[in-house]
Amino acid sequence: MMNRFRKWLYKPKRSDPQLLAQFYYADEELNQVAAELDSLDGRKEPQRCTLLVSQFRSCQDNVLNIINQIMEECIPQDRAPRDFCVKFPEEIRHDNLAGQLWFGAECLAAGSIIMNRELESMAMRPLAKELTRSLEDVRGTLRDQALRDLNTYTEKMREALRRFDVLFAEFELSYVSAMVPVKSPREYYVQQEVIVLFCETVERALDFGYLTQDMIDDYEPALMFTIPRLAIVCGLVVYADGPLNLDRKVEDMSELFRPFHTLLRKIRDLLQALTEEELHTLERSLCVSQDVELPIRADTQAPSALAPTFSASLPPEETLSASANNPEAELACSMQYDDQELEELSRMVHRAGDEMSSLLSPPSACQSPAHRPGSEASPRGEASPARARLKSGSDEEERVFFMDDVEVTESPARPESPGNTFELTQGNAQQRGQDGQSGEVGVEAPALVKEEDWSNNNVEGDKIKLASLMGSTSCSCLDSQLYLDGWEVSAEDAETAEMIAHRTGGMKLSATVIFNPKSPTSQDSAVAAQEAPGHGTSPLEPRAEGTGDNSHKLSTTATNCLLHSCVCCGSCGDSRDDAVERLREKCGPGSVISASNPSVSLAKGGDKEPERIDEAQPSDVTLPAEDASNRQEPKAPASSKCLAHTSGPQVDTASRLQGEGEVKGQPEPEARKQDPEKSPVVSGDSPRGDVAQTEHQHLLGSSSTVGSCSLDNTRLDVATAAMPVTPMATREKIRSRFHGSHDLIHRLFVCISGVADQLQTNYASDLRSILKTLFEVMATKPETDDKEKLKKVTQTLRSAALEDCALCQETVSSSELAAKTRDGDFEDPPEWVPDEACGFCTSCKAPFTVIRRKHHCRSCGKIFCSRCSSHSAPLPRYGQVKPVRVCTHCYMFHVTPFYSDKTGM
């Protein structure tokens, strides 16, 4: 009864601006909507129910906002800390968050469960019940105080507000943490480091002229893509110790770049191989918002700063660029093949990590002949790949073997001896080239591969390299089965390079593709030994048996080499190449390293039965060499490859040494002229033509003797560990995998853009927050000194006089105006400009419309729009004591005493 009388007597007015009065009516409206919602049947009137729920949520927001204002006024020093709100995602930090939290607390208190958050819901239910009770106490206390005294805050009300504030802050953190991921302090600190990196990147871009200050001040939309791209480059190269430091743990990286850790490592290696000019070219291309083509460089070789030292030793008439004249060779060895590249780019947005990682490696196992470190091995600039790439999609692709630049068809058969020796025999062979064709690069891809077709491309060094690098070591990370024994394919079943390349999605290589559709597993494999012709001979000369004129046995180690080459990571092949380089430096060009492996055989065509190597012989076996007396040299000599694989940890170091394809002496044609008896041949007239005679005369140069440098595995490891690889060699090795400078920049552009643009999709909220902070920092101009500020303000005020303003032209001081006002001597107000005489705002020149109306300034009488005449001030000089409408100019310079005194200076 007393509350009813108090409500009737002390009920506040609706127009009362005091907070308790506003709360009273907001709470009344909330109770009315809640009562109507309780009495409504939502099944019969779903639309009405939806409308009331929306209205109820709005009323809750209004009540909580007023309570928050009361707490700011009542207990400003006792508020619960809410620093955790900075960790919330930006999309949930809005004005309606408090109402959503209230609604969630009521649902949890009533027994509801958050979907997929059962454990969190059960843990928060006691807190939600306590929060709802505290909120009801606060509402009752404030409503009671609004009926008593609107200007007084009792201690009871203060205590209720303190308790509610603490509970609401605790529930806010718990509820939001359960609904959305909240950053830990460490993650928040890392994100701040990313913000600093972005700011430093923009500073650097401004210094180099990539961006302009106007673009930042205008919030250019293209910067949302440009800045993250440049930040990746700066974070990997310029500020390598920052948040993109890849040498620390992956867990310590920002979650923005953590999924791209492996890809960023590859990008960093390629960026470090760039010159300064190439780096600037890449950064300029990353700043372009439109899809423009990268500038094509005229040179396809490495820049002068990274030019290899061996280029000067090549014959002038046979430079590296000459090898690019053959269009089919360029097609076979180039990295550019548009169809597959376009397909890669189209899938990049959805599979950024895998696809862009593959783009960083050459799409073909064959490198461009004009850009390989092994190009100096032959005047023709030919070299074989450092390693073969395998696609692990199917068994078919794992059983594809490419023989580099050699067109050969061989009928594979089971080896005669099941031990550690593999055999390769050859029947009659036909010579394709006649009368000097041996001096050309014979690169062809035959549509039909015949048994009799043997082509010599003068790639003896390539054969040694391919045999050694493919079969020297096996990578433990690739445990695929060896498809070796018991398969035999006729010439009709062999597929051409075009067919298999088309089916497997790879690039057409001008090489014979040996494909084995079905082959069982073999447990044994051996090391292939290449013959080294010279004056020194070896007592070991095992031979293989030829089965016929037109039937050829393929050593099954060819497939074994491919299956055991490391294709899952690039570091294995790189380390292998580094070991070969260090070994060559130690032993010299005239040394031959033999493996400490007794199972070394030379597969050679002939009628004799294969001879086994006596196991009682020493482990260090010198490479077998053959007398040159039994050889013949046709006009266009042909050769084949003897490939094998090591079944154990032993490494055929001789093959590895020769596999680099280094030429340490005179060119091959001159060597052939001096000693024609030492040239490798495969006689087409003799059924006992030599097969797999891979000699290294061009490796020895003019040296007539072959030295031997026998090392066991332990000494080899010591030698390789003692000689580190120089950074220049590493950069050259990386650059040699790409067709040229333009191709390297293009690959980096694609991958960096893919990673940066992927951030827009995966981490839109974090990136938006980072860019928002970035623009706030970078758009701020450097502040000047206070004296300079004062000078600028004074100059502005003095120059603020308008020529058409009568008040600016008068010379009466403010003191004289004040004296006239005290004496009651008022001036006549200025004449108003007629409405029909002005169709535009005097200040902003905006045309007047039905919506934009005309307003007269009471101080100067001119016509302005509402925006330019929004101020009100008394005009004592005209007798106007109450505030009247004045324009902005008059308000700033003629009405306010401070500015009026300044204008009188």
From Swiss-Prot:
Q: Does the keyword Protein biosynthesis apply?
A: no
Tissue expression summary:
Enriched in brain (at protein level).
Q: Where is the composition biased (Basic and acidic residues)?
A: 542-552, 605-615, 659-678
Q: Tell me if Coiled coil is a UniProt keyword of this record.
A: no
Q: Where does Zn(2+) 1 bind?
A: C841, C844, C865, C868
GO cellular component terms, alphabetically, are:
cytosol; early endosome membrane
Q: Which residues carry this modification: Phosphothreonine?
A: T512, T888
Phosphoserine carried by residues: S334
Give the chief site where it resides: cytoplasm
Zinc finger FYVE-type: from-to: 835-895
Instruction: Offer an example of a GO molecular function term for this protein.
Output: zinc ion binding
The annotated crosslink position for Glycyl lysine isopeptide (Lys-Gly) (interchain with G-Cter in ubiquitin) is K87
Q: Which superkingdom?
A: Eukaryota
Report the CDD domains cross-referenced here.
FYVE_LST2
Give me the residues that bind Zn(2+) 2, please. Answer: C857, C860, C887, C890
Summarizing the function annotation, the protein's role is: Negative regulator of epidermal growth factor receptor (EGFR) signaling. Acts by promoting EGFR degradation in endosomes when not monoubiquitinated.
Q: What is the protein's quaternary organization?
A: Interacts with TRIM3.
- The entry's protein name is Lateral signaling target protein 2 homolog
For this protein's source organism, the top of the classification is: Eukaryota, Metazoa, Chordata, Craniata, Vertebrata
The protein's gene is named: Zfyve28
